[in-house]
Amino acid sequence: MSAFSALRVAALLSSLPAFALIFAPAHAQELRNGGKLLLTNGVSTIEGSGGGGLATWSTIAGNATQEGIGGSVHGTVIELPDYNWTSYGVALGFFDRVELSYARQNLDTIDIGTALGLGRGYTLNQDVFGAKLRLAGDVVYGDALMPQIAIGVQHKRSSDAAVVAAVGGGSPNGTDFYISATKLFLSQSVLANATVRFTKANQNGLLGFGSATADDHRPQFEGSLAYQFSRRFVVGGEYRTKPDNLAIAREDDWVDLFAAYALTRNVTVTAAYVDLGSIATADNQRGAFLSLQAAF
């Protein structure tokens, strides 16, 4: 990952709407009311919700406990052989019970855009609006075998309806539903997560939702396993299955190997090796992932 990529992450964070920045770290103490254990709020997914990088967890965004309001902002860059991905977003957590999130996703097609007839550097865009509700359990406390369980919804709106129609997508807009279970086993320093997502998204929704022959929500799995070397440093891996709806291009499952480090209580950096398989006729899309999160 180049220094230029790190600058791009910083630039993404600076481009967030002003309302996302009104909760400055200086006010974190009264909102946090003691706060969660370091890193137990997870980081920000590419869809803006709290979790890992690729997989959604049941964690609620921000450092606040059940007595406070918290949140986070993030910027993410993924550099692949034939594409560049950027996303940024904001999430708010209310009393460690409810999470509301927003993310903007951008996929720069670089030279592939010319091959697809879109023009070099054509960028696919999508907005993701999310809500999550914690139903039971706690990531850290309570019964050692009882995970934190949450349900969630993510409504996605592509900005490229003409492209979606051209590749055979059924609709430029769609909604995912999921249920997640997450637990940190403190004595073993191991975090485990399992999520079942009901979706018909093509390439996360950037190529629309469903097709003429596959227009039903189908369950997909998102799993994460991480080991905490210290209070500040975590390594792990994730696996996310994907639907394969489009006849024009194969869609593969996603895998990553990541490391997350808490620079401070409020700032976490995550780096990963990602394998996103085939994207819109371009195979072997493996590369580097870098994300910066600021949480309060």
Each model region followed by its residue ranges:
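Sec/Tat signal peptide C-region and signal peptidase I cleavage site
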Residues: F19-A28
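Bacterial N-terminal signal peptides that target proteins for export
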Residues: M1-S14
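Surface-exposed beta-strand-turn/loop segments characteristic
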Residues: I110, Q203-F209
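Transmembrane beta-barrel domains of Gram-negative outer membranes and organellar outer membranes
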Residues: A28-V190, T199-K200, S230-F233, P243-N245, ...
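Outer membrane beta-barrel transmembrane domains
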Residues: L207-F296
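Transmembrane alpha-helix/helix-exit interface in multi-pass inner-membrane proteins
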Residues: N193-T195
